[in-house]
Amino acid sequence: MKKNKNYVDLKDQPVPEGQHLLEVDDLKMYFHTEDGVVRAVDGVSYTLDRGETLGVVGESGSGKSVTAMTIMGLISMPPGKIEGGDVRYRGRSILEMTEEEMQHIRGNDIAMIFQDPMTSLNPVYKIGRQVGEGLRLHRGYSKQEALKRATELLDLVGIPEPEKRVNEYPHQFSGGMRQRVMIAMALACDPDILIADEPTTALDVTIQAQIIELMQEMQEKNGNAIIMITHDLGVVADMADKIMVMYAGRPVEFGTAEEIFYESRHPYTWGLIRSIPEQAIEEKKPLTPIHGNPPSLMNLPEGCVFSPRCPYATDKCRKQRPERVVTESGHYSACHYSGDPEFLTNAPETSRTRKDSKKGGEA
């Protein structure tokens, strides 16, 4: 089995000492339109290592998917333009790679599961051909070899009768099964990093749980790093090692899953937590929505971008953009008052009581 003669596999190269598998450093992606500049991603930073899961959470328009598409090199330029920052994979800048180099990266080193499998799968090609396409491109598999491996992958992700289903078309699969096909496609070349963009949004709760469990099983087996993009904090509650909360193109809070759920410091994160049905049940209170709408990314408010919707906003919030307040552990939040103990008493009940209850359980 031969690889393409021009094939470059960065996975064969070690991560440089002192660096991470993936490093996103102050990334800024703007779109220049006739109506103005859209600051879609404005200062995103995080690191990721093999075996880790990062949850990226926020409402529609927060910049979650644009960040992922920038990493994959799938943003059209123009109108998109990198205004600052860098993305490094195994020590190499992705933003400086040529399109030919990125074609070797996509699907092989970094793979992506898109939000809607029905529009991501080609309706006129059989599933086996689509799952095996990456293997033929990146691994030099023959048509027969790719089909055999595609059958194995469908079996791996829990699709019954894979020998039969590999010769069927996307419309013959249910929504949950199509999403499993997308996961099989993404895992075909054993990527270092798997980006899952709202992979469970259109699925019912039972199928959501199955898809998340499947991704966790694949990660345990292969050691992939996962970036899980979602608008629902509840989806990443038991899956993520660390979580970045985004709002209006900016990261407003970042920390371990434990810190975000039980020591959160930003009012927007509190709003997302209170929007989780299980949290409302725990507090014995009705669901509390975040009132208002996200701002236009072409006309962001002065000061804190969340201030028009924040129930705790002051004149300082409305006039000054907050700096990130960072704790010793690296947990940060972009709020003027996130270091104020009295202000933090406004956090959801779970955030304020988790530590005490854990101590009580350990005693």
Question: Could you describe each region identified by the protein language model?
Answer:
Residues 90-93, 144-164:
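Conserved ABC ATPase "signature" region
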Residues 10, 14-20, 160-164, 256-358:
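Short catalytic/signature loops enriched in Gly
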